[in-house]
Amino acid sequence: MASLNEIKKRIKIIESTSKITNAMKLVSSAKLKKQKELFLNESIYYKKFYDLFTYIKSNSDSEILSLKKSEEGKTIWLAFFSSMGLCGSFNLNIVKELQKHIKSNDEIWLIGKKGKNLIKSKGIEAEISLDLELDDKDINFDLFHIIAENLLAKYKNDYNIKSIKVIYSKFVNSLSFTPSVFSLLPLDKAIEKPRLDKPNNGADFSIQPNANDVFESILIDYLATCIHGAIVESKVCENASRRNAMDSATKNANELIKNYKLEFNRKRQSEITQEITEIVSGAKGE
C-alpha cells in the first residue's frame, strides 16, 4: 500500500498533467472556432464554384473527360493526416478507411506528418510518393494549386493511373466526424450528370470563347478547390478531435485526483486513529 508521501506525489503529478491537458483543450477550442468559421465561410464559395464548374463541364467535350485508362491501373490516394499528435483516433480512422480500398500497386500522397509511420505500422505496402508536413499556417490555395497541377499532369500522361482519390475527415458536428472518400479524377459521378440550367446565382452569362477552353482553363482551379476544401474540413475535424481528447483527459485526471485524495484522507485518518489507539494503550499501561 502506498504511503501518504507517495500519494501526495501522485496527486501533484496528476494535477500538473491536468493543467497541461486543460490548457491544450483551450488552445484546441480556439483553433476549432477559427477553423470552423473558415470552413463555413468557404463552403459558400465551394458551392457556387461547384455549380458553375458543373454547368461548364456539362457543355464541354474536352478530351480529358474521355481518356482511356488501364482497367488494371493504379489509384493515387491523396490522404490527409494531422502534423501534430494528441488528437484521439483522428489519424487511425483515416488509415482504417484507407485499408478498405487501397491495393498494393497504388500510390499514396500524404499530407500531414503523422501519416507515414502510422501507414507503415499497419502494413500498408503501397508506395508513398509524397510526404508533406503541413501546419495550419501552411494552408494556402497556391500550394494546393501546385499539387493539383502535378496530379492532373500524371493523370493525363500516364495510362496506368486510372484514378485519383481523396481521403479525408468529413465534419458532421463537433463530436462526430467520419473518414470520407471522393474521386478527384475521373471527375466525381455527380458532375457527370448533364446540366442545362445555369447556376442560380442571379447572374446572366455566356461561356466564351467556348465551353472546352473555359473548362480546361478552370479544371486546375476546380481540383485545387476540392483539395483545399478537404484539408480545411480535415483541420476542423482534427482540432475538434484534439479538443475532445484533451477534455476527456482532463476529466479523467480530475477523477483520479478525487480518488487519490479520498485514499489519502482514509489512510491519514487510519494512521491518526492508530496513533490515538497507541497513545491510549500506553496511558492505560502506565
From Swiss-Prot:
<keyword id="KW-0066">ATP synthesis</keyword>
<dbReference type="InterPro" id="IPR035968">
    <property type="entry name" value="ATP_synth_F1_ATPase_gsu"/>
</dbReference>
<keyword id="KW-1003">Cell membrane</keyword>
<dbReference type="Pfam" id="PF00231">
    <property type="entry name" value="ATP-synt"/>
</dbReference>
<dbReference type="GO" id="GO:0005524">
    <property type="term" value="F:ATP binding"/>
</dbReference>
<comment type="subunit">
    <text>F-type ATPases have 2 components, CF(1) - the catalytic core - and CF(0) - the membrane proton channel. CF(1) has five subunits: alpha(3), beta(3), gamma(1), delta(1), epsilon(1). CF(0) has three main subunits: a, b and c.</text>
</comment>
<comment type="similarity">
    <text>Belongs to the ATPase gamma chain family.</text>
</comment>
<keyword id="KW-0813">Transport</keyword>
<keyword id="KW-0375">Hydrogen ion transport</keyword>
<dbReference type="GO" id="GO:0046933">
    <property type="term" value="F:proton-transporting ATP synthase activity, rotational mechanism"/>
</dbReference>
<comment type="function">
    <text>Produces ATP from ADP in the presence of a proton gradient across the membrane. The gamma chain is believed to be important in regulating ATPase activity and the flow of protons through the CF(0) complex.</text>
</comment>
<dbReference type="GO" id="GO:0005886">
    <property type="term" value="C:plasma membrane"/>
</dbReference>
<dbReference type="GO" id="GO:0045259">
    <property type="term" value="C:proton-transporting ATP synthase complex"/>
</dbReference>
<keyword id="KW-0406">Ion transport</keyword>
<dbReference type="InterPro" id="IPR000131">
    <property type="entry name" value="ATP_synth_F1_gsu"/>
</dbReference>
<dbReference type="GO" id="GO:0042777">
    <property type="term" value="P:proton motive force-driven plasma membrane ATP synthesis"/>
</dbReference>
<keyword id="KW-0139">CF(1)</keyword>
<protein>
    <recommendedName>
        <fullName>ATP synthase gamma chain</fullName>
    </recommendedName>
</protein>
<keyword id="KW-0472">Membrane</keyword>
